[in-house]
């Protein structure tokens, strides 16, 4: 019999298993869509547990020293292998034999120093080979000769001193060769002979200290269209020599950024006259002097970059010959500082006259003294002009400032950061095609009369944000009815509440920004007529008073009529109230920002019409309760919610529904775990809202329906009781009338002949009442006849005998019960006694009691030996106090008179 293992052995075996699992999980690759990512896992060998059908394997940022071919045999479908940022020092030829479909091989940032003829012998399908940032100092023989399909070869950041990568023709499909950041110092004839049959398009030689371009060094590269020699310390003379060597080539793009080209002249680019150069980058060269006709040899040039230079003077012939130029970048090209205007960089009149095809001109961040009458003359196709932070003394825009742009189809004009303080009437009258005007970040301080925009017939956007102050008038924008976007952020806006509204002439307005203006007074017609408005920014103002119910005249409904509004920003306005109809017309609203206000309790139906709401921001308010009746409609289709930093009251009544909604919603809730904290009650202070336990709240949930049912039943019962109490007689009356009109009053009785319908027993003092109410009934119904002592007793007959005879000849006996009856000796001793005795002897239910007063049962029994329980309910009648019930009483009496006498 085997003995069980000791407990501590089980314990340590469990720890070992856990350590193995944790170790393996720490080195777990991510596989998705046939792509395996094994990067940053500190791997020292190739994983052997990946799916065999992967096509991409990422092994970057590990500790691999080799790529053993045997380890890749199971991954024969690989097309991309990335082994960058490892410590691989050697490539084995069999690697590509194990990966016959490999197309991209990336081995950047490794320790490879040598490449043999056999290294890539089996890599015939390779299209990209990345070997940058290794230790390759020299290419011996022909390691790339079998790479017939290679398109891109990257050998940058190595120690190569020559561009010669082979001894025989090869790489016939190569299009990109990257050799930047090496130690190449000269380009001599024959170095590119190995590419004699190639289709090389781009050659990257940047950051090489090249000092010589030997004659014919590029002639082998017949299809070369792009050459980069950035940061190569090329001098003007060496640049001129380079251009001569590029003569009669297919060069189209030439990048010479960050060199030592401080001067260019008529001869600098002379060698390029036999080319079709379209792009030239001369940025960051500390260029000071641009001689006349410097670009005369470049008639095909379309893009010229001169940014980040220090040009001193632009003459009328500086751009001569650039008849096809479409884009000119002069950003930070004229940056010389001087306290004297005469020493500032100069732009002569007609300097741009040769640029007939120019469409884009960027002159940002320069130091021009101003704009002359003919500065931009000749730019007949200019569409985009950027002059941000370009002038040192452009304080006022006059009607002559842009005279030189008259007639050009300018669409965008950027004048930001120029310290402009005033816009005169008609300043833009020459720019009839302008669509976007940016005047932000200046020092404009004036009243807008509307004449400033005269002539802007096609304007779409005016940006005036971040200026000194702007005072509006009714006519401020009457000249620009086509305006769609108006930005007036942080301009100390004045007179916003003028009437009619300054924005009323803008029926096409789509975006309006009035934020950061400390606006406190606006009227309900401010946005009237802006039916196309989609975005409204009013944050960082002081509009709290407008929505208070205590506001004189009530809350100001300034959002009414904005039927197509999509985005509304009302943050930081101090709101502590929201009118119930504030958002009534905003049915297409998609985003509301009410953050950083003082909101606590919101009206229940405030969001009922926001059926399209996708984003709701209520952060940093005083909201304690999030209930379904308020937020349910708003949360229905929500994609983003921000209610951070609110003092939530973590009770069932306040947030139970909210917590349940959080647990089931797919809405993006910003920083839910950290900034949605309970404030009250004290035991939950600082506790995350999402962790609030709602299970105690659910205990009452099953009884909610029962509670509602009980409430409804109780209300119905109370209603019925009140109805019966106040109108029961009427209901009974109409019911009895309906029934007896169909069935009649008299029930079937045994065949007996009675002379009277009823004999009425009453006290002598009640005779007037009896006569008053019995006679009308007899007149109304001739078949009905009562026996009345004063009228129907036979003359000469003893009273007692007459009473007995009358009772015998009457079908019913009516007692008119009053206090008088209880005290009447004759009634008590004879009439009542005899009537009851006859009814008992004949086994009849023939007695009807009519109570004219409220007589307790015990008094009735004491005086007449009668109780109400001795008679049928329909034979006990009470005389009504209300006159309108008399008819109902008469009807009940007729029913009682017509009822059957038999007791069985």
UniProtKB/Swiss-Prot annotation:
SMART domains: LRR_SD22 (SM00365), LRR_TYP (SM00369), LRRCT (SM00082), TIR (SM00255). Glycans are attached at residues 53, 58, 71, 125, 197, 248, 253, 276, 292, 399, 637, 663, 668. There is a cross-link at residues 765, 812, 831 (Glycyl lysine isopeptide (Lys-Gly) (interchain with G-Cter in ubiquitin)). It comes from the Eukaryota. Residues 1-26 form the signal peptide. The keyword Transmembrane applies. It is found in: Endoplasmic reticulum membrane; Endosome membrane; Early endosome. InterPro entries: Cys-rich_flank_reg_C, Leu-rich_rpt, Leu-rich_rpt_typical-subtyp, LRR_dom_sf, SLRP, TIR_dom, TLR3_TMD, Toll_tir_struct_dom_sf. Residues 27-705 are lumenal. Residues 727-904 are cytoplasmic. Keywords: Disulfide bond, Endoplasmic reticulum, Endosome, Glycoprotein, Immunity, Inflammatory response, Innate immunity, Isopeptide bond, Leucine-rich repeat, Membrane, Phosphoprotein, Receptor, Repeat, RNA-binding, Signal, Transmembrane, Transmembrane helix, Ubl conjugation. Residues 646-699 form the LRRCT domain. GO terms for cellular component: early endosome; endoplasmic reticulum membrane; endosome membrane; extracellular matrix; extracellular space. LRR repeats lie at residues 53-74, 77-98, 101-122, 125-146, 149-170, 173-194, 199-220, 223-245, 250-271, 276-297, 300-321, 324-345, 357-378, 381-401, 409-430, 433-455, 466-487, 508-529, 532-553, 564-585, 588-609, 612-633. The keyword Transferase does not apply. GO terms for molecular function: double-stranded RNA binding; signaling receptor activity. Key component of innate and adaptive immunity. TLRs (Toll-like receptors) control host immune response against pathogens through recognition of molecular patterns specific to microorganisms. TLR3 is a nucleotide-sensing TLR which is activated by double-stranded RNA, a sign of viral infection. Acts via the adapter TRIF/TICAM1, leading to NF-kappa-B activation, IRF3 nuclear translocation, cytokine secretion and the inflammatory response. ds-RNA binding is mediated by LRR 1 to 3, and LRR 17 to 18. Belongs to the Toll-like receptor family. This is Toll-like receptor 3. The gene is TLR3.
């Amino acid at each position: 019999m085997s003995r069980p293992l000791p407990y501590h052995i089980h314990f340590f075996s469990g720890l070992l298993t856990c350590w193995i699992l944790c170790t393996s999980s720490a080195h777990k690759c991510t596989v998705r869509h046939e792509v395996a990512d094994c990067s940053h896992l500190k791997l020292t060998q190739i994983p052997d547990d990946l799916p065999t059908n992967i096509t991409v394997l990422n092994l970057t940022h590990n500790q691999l020293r080799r790529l053993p071919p045997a380890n890749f045999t199971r991954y024969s479908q690989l097309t991309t292998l990335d082994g960058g940022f490892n410590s691989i020092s050697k490539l084995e030829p069999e690697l590509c034999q194990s990966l016959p479909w490999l197309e991209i091989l990336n081995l950047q940032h490794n320790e490879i120093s040598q490449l043999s003829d056999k290294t890539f012998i089996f890599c015939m399908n390779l299209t990209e080979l990345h070997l940058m940032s290794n230790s390759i100092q020299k290419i011996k023989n022909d390691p790339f000769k079998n790479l017939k399909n290679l398109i891109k070869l990257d050998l940058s950041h190595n120690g190569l001193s020559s561009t010669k990568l082979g001894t025989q023709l090869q790489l016939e499909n190569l299009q990109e060769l990257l050799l930047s950041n090496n130690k190449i110092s000269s380009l001599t004839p024959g170095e590119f002979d190995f590419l004699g049959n190639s289709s090389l398009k781009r050659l990257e030689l940047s950051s090489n200290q090249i000092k010589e371009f030997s004659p014919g060094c590029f002639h082998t590269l017949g299809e070369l269209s792009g050459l980069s020699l950035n940061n190569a310390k090329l001098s003007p003379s060496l640049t001129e020599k380079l251009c001569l060597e590029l003569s009669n080539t297919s060069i189209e793009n030439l990048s010479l950024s960050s060199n030592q080209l401080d001067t260019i002249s008529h001869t600098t680019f002379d060698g390029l006259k036999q080319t079709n150069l379209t792009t030239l980058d001369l940025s960051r060269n500390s260029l000071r002097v641009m001689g006349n006709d410097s670009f005369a040899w470049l008639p095909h040039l379309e893009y010229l970059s001169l940014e980040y230079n220090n040009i001193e003077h632009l003459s009328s012939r500086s751009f001569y010959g650039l008849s096809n130029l479409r884009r000119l970048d002069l950003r930070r090209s004229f940056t010389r500082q001087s306290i004297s205007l005469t020493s500032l960089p100069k732009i002569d009149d007609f300097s741009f006259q040769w640029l007939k095809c120019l469409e884009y001109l960027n002159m940002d961040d320069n130091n021009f003294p101003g704009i002359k009458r003919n500065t931009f003359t000749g730019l007949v196709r200019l569409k985009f002009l950027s002059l941000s932070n370009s002038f040192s003394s452009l304080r006022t825009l006059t009607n002559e400032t842009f005279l030189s742009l008259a007639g050009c189809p300018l669409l965008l004009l950027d004048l930001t950061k120029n310290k402009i303080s005033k816009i005169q009437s008609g300043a833009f009258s020459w720019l009839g095609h302008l669509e976007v005007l940016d005047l932000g970040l200046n020092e404009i301080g004036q009243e807008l009369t509307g004449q400033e925009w005269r002539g802007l017939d096609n304007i779409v956007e005016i940006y005036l944000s971040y200026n000194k102050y702007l005072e509006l008038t009714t006519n401020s924008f009457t000249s620009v009815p086509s305006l769609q976007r108006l930005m007036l952020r942080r301009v100390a806006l004045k007179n916003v509440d003028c009437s009619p509204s300054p924005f009323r002439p803008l029926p096409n307005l789509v975006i309006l920004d009035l934020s950061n203006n400390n606006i406190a007074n606006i009227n309900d017609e401010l946005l009237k007529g802006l039916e196309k408005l989609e975005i409204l920014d009013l944050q960082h103002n002081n509009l709290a008073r407008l929505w208070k119910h205590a506001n004189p005249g009530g809350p100001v409904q300034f959002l009414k009529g904005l039927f197509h509004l999509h985005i509304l920003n009302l943050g930081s306005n101090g709101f502590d109230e929201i009118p119930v109809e504030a958002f009534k017309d905003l049915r297409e609203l998609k985003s509301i920002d009410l953050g950083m206000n003082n909101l606590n309790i919101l009206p229940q139906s405030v969001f009922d019409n926001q059926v399209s709401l996708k984003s709701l921001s209520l952060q940093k308010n005083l909201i304690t309760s999030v209930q379904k009746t308020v937020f349910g409609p708003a949360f229905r289709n929500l994609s983003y919610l921000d209610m951070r930093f609110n003092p939530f009251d973590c009770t069932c009544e306040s947030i139970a529904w909210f917590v349940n909604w959080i647990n089931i919603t797919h809405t993006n809730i910003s920083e839910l775990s950290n900034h949605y904290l309970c404030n009250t009650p004290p035991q939950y202070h600082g506790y995350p809202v999402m962790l609030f336990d709602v299970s105690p709240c659910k205990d009452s949930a099953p009884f909610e329906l029962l509670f509602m049912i009980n409430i409804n039943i109780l209300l119905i019962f109370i209603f019925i009781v009140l109805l019966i109490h106040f109108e029961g007689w009427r209901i009974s009356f109409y019911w009895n009338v309906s029934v007896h009109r169909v069935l009649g009053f008299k029930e079937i009785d045994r065949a007996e002949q009675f002379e009277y319908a009823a004999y009425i027993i009453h006290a002598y003092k009640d005779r007037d009442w009896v006569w008053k109410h019995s006679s009308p009934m007899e007149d109304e119904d001739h078949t009905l006849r009562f026996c009345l002592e004063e009228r129907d007793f036979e003359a000469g007959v003893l009273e007692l005998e007459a009473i007995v005879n009358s009772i015998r000849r009457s079908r019913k006996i009516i007692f008119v019960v009053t206090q008088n009856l209880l005290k009447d000796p004759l009634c008590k001793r004879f009439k009542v006694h005899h009537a009851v005795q006859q009814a008992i002897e004949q086994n009849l239910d023939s007695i009807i009691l009519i109570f004219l007063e409220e007589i307790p049962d015990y008094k009735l029994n004491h005086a007449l030996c009668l109780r109400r329980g001795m008679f049928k309910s329909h034979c006990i009648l009470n005389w009504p106090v209300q006159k309108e019930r008399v008819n109902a009483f008469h009807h009940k009496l007729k029913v009682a008179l017509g009822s059957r006498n038999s007791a069985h």
